[in-house]
Amino acid sequence: MVNEFDKLRPGKLLLASANLLESNFKRTVLLMCEHNEQGSMGFILNRPMEFKVCEAIAGFEDIEEPLHMGGPVQVDTVHFIHSRGDSIDGAIEIFDGVFWGGDKDQLSYLINTGVINPNEIRFFLGYSGWGAGQLEQEFEEGSWYTADATREMIFTDAYERMWSRSVRSKGGEYRIVANSPELPGLN
């Protein structure tokens, strides 16, 4: 198998392998936002929470979209990815047309005035992070795969099928993995 870790960079998807059973990351799809010699960080895309953005974040009372669990690190922080880097100061482009962060007050104003559609944004509590060498070790243990991200995938609401579709998109032997049961030992 190709060394998956070498493919990792901002804008790539990090897919939990079928063998990764740890509850924070089981069958997760993460968007990588930073990846360098000091470590890596990203957000879990397929873990919508029970409550909505309007119930949890001041200034975004009109957003009925679910808030997402970005990961187990600093779960008291709010982050967002979006497709409107042209309109939000301080946004960092992760890959073509997908941005991370920026001026939160400006974002709130643009949403409340109808300039930005809430479907163009995903809000996260916390993030997923790894120190130097940690994620590489997890790749060596077979815990992760990589895949290409698309704007459509980032802003979809098809969370339940996101992992299997992402793994299947890699083709070959991954198609079998994508269809494997969550707990193969119970079959």
Swiss-Prot record:
Pfam families: DUF179 (PF02622). SUPFAM superfamilies: VC0467-like. GO terms for cellular component: cytosol. PANTHER family: UNCHARACTERIZED PROTEIN YQGE (PTHR30327), UPF0301 PROTEIN YQGE (PTHR30327:SF1). Belongs to the UPF0301 (AlgH) family. This is UPF0301 protein Clim_0777. It comes from Chlorobium limicola (strain DSM 245 / NBRC 103803 / 6330).
